[in-house]
Regions:
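Short, low-complexity disordered leader/linker segments with a strong preference
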Residues: 1-33, 334
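An extracytoplasmic/periplasmic, membrane-proximal ligand-sensing/linker region
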Residues: 190, 296-334
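Periplasmic-binding protein-like
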Residues: 134, 162-171, 195-198, 204-205, 237-262, 276-299
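Conserved N-terminal structural module of periplasmic/extracytoplasmic solute-binding proteins
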Residues: 21-89, 284
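Extracytoplasmic ligand-binding site segments that recognize negatively charged/polar headgroups
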Residues: 34-48, 69-73, 85-220
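A bilobed periplasmic-binding-protein/Venus flytrap-type ligand-binding module shared by bacterial periplasmic
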Residues: 137-144, 183, 254-269, 285
């Protein structure tokens, strides 16, 4: 009898352990969030070192941050993975490539949407929630000795041969932004500009991280980036060496957003993450990404004085962006 009781006790203990482990695993599952982001969001220059730890501390939710390449590559990764994707939230989807992601996302009417200016809320269905914005610009190395160009067409001149780094519109939101910029500024001449620059530029990088890395390594003194890019160098390197150029053509605007993936099993955690981006993380996001916060009440550091403000700004719809990328692929990327 004692042996039977002993065996039963062991069985009860074992089942209790299994049950406790199951509960623990479920609890852990509820407290985990997988976020896909473009590489620089996850890297040394990005948000991983500040925003993610702060979110984890504030909420108790563990974030699995996945560097998925450039923004378009991150979208494509989710699409290719289909129902098997681990992704709960995708960040870094800009307004000019938004139509590539809409069908992958669930709407979320965050209570903090009211802090965002209506002009920045490009998705009326709230599948993509803006968290920062800026304008594209060419950044140059003021110690390189070159004469800084003042327009898009100036870049096609022989004196800038092999001195400019561009980015591919098919794989990067920065490249897509440059494409829209040339279209809005040059009209029908945008194709000729790209044909000339394809030969004149040092390279057309696959993403911003690769392109800007080549620039800071001294491979070329000019790179496509943002008017706000000098902020990083002022804040973290204490240098004004790298400066954004204001062109007479005007500049293309961009808005970065995050969205919740359809079918996520961590909807509550995903909502908490989006809300955090719109509140506590706003200044850290702006500083880490060298962009402007969407919440206009945020007080900006003095380093933002080094970001020039364009007098003329363009915006382009996502469907037009897709159309032009197709044309670019057919005529330029042959």
């Amino acid at each position: 009898m004692k042996k039977v009781l002993s065996v039963c006790a062991v069985l009860v203990f074992a089942l209790s352990c299994i049950f406790a482990q199951s509960i623990s695993e479920k609890s852990e599952e509820r407290k985990t969030l997988t976020v896909y982001a473009y590489d620089t969001f996850c890297g040394d220059w990005g948000v991983a070192g500040s925003v993610i730890p702060a979110f984890e501390k504030a909420t108790g939710i563990k974030v699995n941050l996945v560097a998925a390449g450039a923004s378009v590559e991150a979208i494509n990764k989710v699409r290719l993975e289909g129902a098997n994707t681990r992704c709960d939230v995708i960040v870094g989807v800009s307004d000019d490539i938004a139509d590539k992601a809409y069908d992958l996302l669930e709407a979320y009417n965050s209570p903090y949407l009211e802090t965002i200016d209506q002009s920045l809320r490009f998705d009326k269905e709230n599948r993509l929630i803006p968290y920062d914005y800026g304008t594209f610009a060419f950044v140059y190395d003021s110690e390189s000795g070159i004469n800084p160009p003042q327009s898009l067409m100036a870049l096609t001149m022989e004196e800038y041969r092999d001195k400019v780094i561009l980015i591919d519109p098919r794989t990067s939101s920065v490249g897509a932004g440059l494409l829209m910029w040339t279209y809005n500024a040059l009209g029908d001449g945008w194709k000729d500009w790209w044909k000339t620059m394809s030969a004149n530029a040092l390279t057309i990088a696959s993403g911003w991280s690769a392109g800007y890395g080549l620039f800071t390594e001294g491979e070329a003194p000019i790179v496509i980036s943002y008017t706000t890019s000098p902020i990083y160098h002022v804040m973290y390197e204490n240098t004004t060496r790298y400066q954004a150029l204001l062109f007479t053509d005007g500049h293309e605007a961009t808005i970065e957003a995050a969205g919740i993936i359809k079918g996520t099993k961590h909807r509550s955690e995903a909502e908490s993450f989006i809300d955090f981006l719109l509140t506590d993380a706003q200044i850290d996001l702006a500083n880490a990404n060298s962009m402007y916060p969407v919440n206009s009440t945020i007080e900006l550091p003095e380093a933002y004085d080094y970001a020039p403000v364009p007098g003329k700004i363009f915006t382009t719809s996502a469907d037009k962006t897709s159309e032009l990328i197709n044309q670019w692929t057919e005529t330029i990327a042959k």
